[in-house]
């Protein structure tokens, strides 16, 4: 199981993308013949006084101040003029599903795009629930944009298949290119990265985050410009290959604007010391291995604490791969200013952890392995009163492992960190009382993801289902937009979600529910639902049909190892032609040929994709 520890923030999916499918006839025109006579006269009079191009110029200047996707979406729906001007003034586009529209539709609608955020595979791909060759290819997007957007400056991809050729075309096509962010992507190697480093002379951001990067034995670090660079952020902690440290040291020295640097595990603590002395301006640091060289180059060990002390601007700290505990005190000098700390790769004990966290009074974001135990979480609760986001990952993700964190840690956090807004908590045991306490103590929660790793586990004290705990979360946390549920849950828990989860946009369900009625409660009761992820739950055809009135308004529905039939999926595909219904991995040669192993449904403006592999059947 792959944990998504890519960024110290939640996905920015709470705002809708602008409508790309609206023809001009679908938008109300205040000058149309359907308007009332008075409105028509007023509109004609106004157009005579102020020509259309004057009004559009004024509107163009106004819309430039709208940054929110949601606001721009609303503006584009006012009338044809607003729709047209909004498209002309939009420089940033977010596409939450690369198959929701074609690249051609994007370039036809928006002519001046400088920044693109594009997402591919659904999130359950992170848990090995999707075959690796499913799709989400970047190739058609970069080839289309190469012709349409010569001024493109930023590409941010997540769960996309990106090849070295794609990166080469990107580097050749956009002379002013500045930012490349690849999160959980695959298909490319150090050869492609070297081309970007060499040809994108204005590059400010190169962030490779949780991506699978092939080692082509290319010295990509040496491919950056030999003179002063524009680099502001360089993250390559996911690159599982040695790097040319001398070239890296020179690159850091030539990058006076560098604020973020995240190193891979092949950079030792001694080398980190040298980098810090040459880059005191850093604000975000990923430390690399945090262990010394196997063969020290000198008898006297460097003063690591002094190097950290020189970096007075560091507020975000991560890394700590291959951690050697005796060196951990070196970070003491920066702890007081930290707002973000990521120990999610460090197997650190409570005794090692507590001296660190007790100095982090400004911390707002904290990620860690469950090796810090309940004792460590109690120290967090006692110290970090400004905490907004907490993520606790399992050191041992097996279902039958002994989890070192429990309801005790969760209860402590809820009592000590009253400003908490987002939590992801992996554990082996939990109680309703602890979850209810969190709902009462942390009413500002927008994200609550509780992952009880053992299947169908009840409240381990009372033996009852976890219904009341999750019910309290949706009832008391009025701002909740994202919810992940687990443990022993009956239909009652889902009834609570449908009754109180009016703002929930993303719901993840694993091993939960009694019957189809559970899913029906959610589909009929959660009007804002956009993303629905379900695995190993007893929901079947009746449940799926109950949401047909909702699917056009949702980004996607994912259901795996449930009780769906291919016949039901075909019926939905026939009834909803603008909904793409993919059946993944079903075997037609056995007795269960009508059984659907995995269903992935999503809305699309351009119909089914043309690159589906053989194991995908589009109904």
Curated annotation (Swiss-Prot):
Annotated residues for binding of 1D-myo-inositol hexakisphosphate: 119, 158-159, 391, 447-449, 482, 530-531, 555
InterPro entries reported for this sequence: COI1_F-box, F-box-like_dom_sf, Leu-rich_rpt_Cys-con_subtyp, LRR_dom_sf, Transp_inhibit
Compartments, as annotated in UniProt: Nucleus
Main location: nucleus
Keywords: Auxin signaling pathway, Nucleus, Ubl conjugation pathway
Record-annotated F-box domain positions: 54-97
Location of region: Interaction with auxin-responsive proteins: 126-127, 394-399, 451-455, 510-511
Site features described as Interaction with auxin-responsive proteins, chain residue numbers: 210, 426, 535
A molecular-function term among this protein's GO annotations: inositol hexakisphosphate binding
GO CC entries: nucleus; SCF ubiquitin ligase complex
Disulfide bonds: none
Pathway: Protein modification; protein ubiquitination
Chain intervals for the UniProt region annotation (Disordered): 1-43
SMART domains hit by this protein: LRR_CC
Keyword Nucleus recorded: yes
GO biological process annotation, one example: protein ubiquitination
Description of how the protein assembles with itself and partners: Part of a SCF (SKP1-cullin-F-box) protein ligase complex. May interact with auxin and auxin-responsive proteins.
PANTHER family assigned to the protein according to its UniProt record, in alphabetical order: F-BOX/TPR REPEAT PROTEIN POF3, TRANSPORT INHIBITOR RESPONSE 1-LIKE PROTEIN
Domain notes: The F-box is necessary for the interaction with SKP1.
Note: The myo-inositol hexakisphosphate acts as a structural cofactor.
Protein's UniProt name: Transport inhibitor response 1-like protein
Species annotation: Arabidopsis thaliana (Mouse-ear cress)
Upper classification of the organism: Eukaryota, Viridiplantae, Streptophyta, Embryophyta, Tracheophyta
